[in-house]
């Protein structure tokens, strides 16, 4: 049959990324406690398109994805990217997985168990000139108490939930749980899925004793990452959904090591 995608394109413009986006697909994630965790990811797959070709072959992305069915996890990224690059005759290949990861957490006083959901993302690329690249990202909800509000108020301080996005490049394998724990330790308080009254009292009082600006949170996380020899690059940003303001508070640090 006629291959329209392989026809010559006269516009002489290279396409940086072309492919398929938002494929819902089952994946396996390494779980520090249970060995593995099954979840569902939103998958994006791209390649570059040379200036002389009209289009890429979209069906080949899905075929490659199906080849790795049952073994689609972070350890297979190099093999998947190489397969994409070879099958589509591309200079660069890209694979992105966005998924929910669940961690069992106990409430701090009564020990009630509940599952916390964390949004995660793994983005990998393979380039003929630059080689492999892999970034792991976690999104962690936190709670903060405003230091200024505590300092100037007689009856308490305003507090709010926030979201921390932490992305890292690493030399050896990194557990999602360890990144989550690093973030939660930098907050005024962790966020829990189940709290009884004794737990709520503890969380409220401990957060009040540990007030944090977004600047404090982002700096505390960056300090730990700078000392970690396994981390070669990181980006951390914090957004607080302010409870008494009509805006969010935001801070960001990005560093290469």
From Swiss-Prot:
Gene Ontology MF term list: GTP cyclohydrolase I activity
Catalytic activity: GTP + H2O = 7,8-dihydroneopterin 3'-triphosphate + formate + H(+)
Gene designation: folE2
Recorded metabolic or biological pathway in which this protein acts: Cofactor biosynthesis; 7,8-dihydroneopterin triphosphate biosynthesis; 7,8-dihydroneopterin triphosphate from GTP: step 1/1
Enzyme Commission identifier(s): 3.5.4.16
Listed InterPro entries: GTP_cyclohydrolase_FolE2 (IPR022838), GTP_cyclohydrolase_FolE2/MptA (IPR003801)
Pfam families given in the database record: GCHY-1
Cysteine disulfide partners in this protein: none
BP-aspect Gene Ontology terms: tetrahydrofolate biosynthetic process
HAMAP family listed in its UniProt record: GTP_cyclohydrol_B
Residues at the site labelled May be catalytically important: 146
Leading EC class: hydrolase
Highest taxon above the source species: Bacteria
The organism's taxonomic lineage, starting at the top: Bacteria, Pseudomonadati, Thermodesulfobacteriota, Syntrophobacteria, Syntrophobacterales
Function: Converts GTP to 7,8-dihydroneopterin triphosphate.
Record bears the keyword Hydrolase: yes
Organism: Syntrophobacter fumaroxidans (strain DSM 10017 / MPOB)
Protein family (similarity comment): Belongs to the GTP cyclohydrolase IV family.
Protein name, as recorded: GTP cyclohydrolase FolE2
Keyword line: Hydrolase
């Amino acid at each position: 049959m006629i291959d329209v995608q392989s026809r010559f394109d006269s516009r002489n413009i290279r396409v940086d990324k072309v492919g398929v986006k938002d494929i819902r697909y089952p994946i396996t994630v390494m779980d520090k406690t249970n060995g593995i965790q099954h979840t569902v990811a939103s998958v994006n797959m791209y390649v570059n398109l040379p200036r002389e070709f009209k289009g890429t072959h979209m069906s080949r992305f899905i075929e490659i994805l199906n080849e790795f069915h049952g073994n689609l996890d972070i350890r297979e990224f190099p093999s998947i990217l190489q397969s994409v690059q070879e099958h589509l005759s591309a200079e660069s290949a890209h694979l992105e997985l966005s998924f929910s990861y669940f961690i069992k957490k106990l409430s701090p006083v009564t020990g009630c168990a509940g599952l916390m959901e964390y949004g995660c993302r793994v983005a990998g690329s393979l380039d003929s000139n630059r080689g492999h690249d892999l970034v792991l990202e976690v999104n962690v909800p936190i709670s903060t108490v405003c230091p200024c509000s505590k300092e100037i108020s007689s009856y308490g301080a305003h507090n709010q939930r926030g979201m921390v996005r932490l992305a890292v490049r690493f030399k050896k394998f990194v557990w999602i749980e360890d990144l989550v724990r690093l973030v939660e330790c930098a907050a005024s308080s962790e966020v829990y899925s189940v709290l009884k009254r004794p737990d709520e009292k503890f969380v409220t009082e401990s957060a009040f004793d540990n007030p944090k600006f977004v600047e404090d949170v982002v700096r505390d996380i960056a300090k730990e990452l700078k000392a970690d020899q396994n981390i070669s690059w990181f980006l951390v940003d914090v957004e607080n959904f302010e409870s008494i303001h009509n805006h969010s508070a935001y801070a960001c640090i990005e560093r290469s090591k």
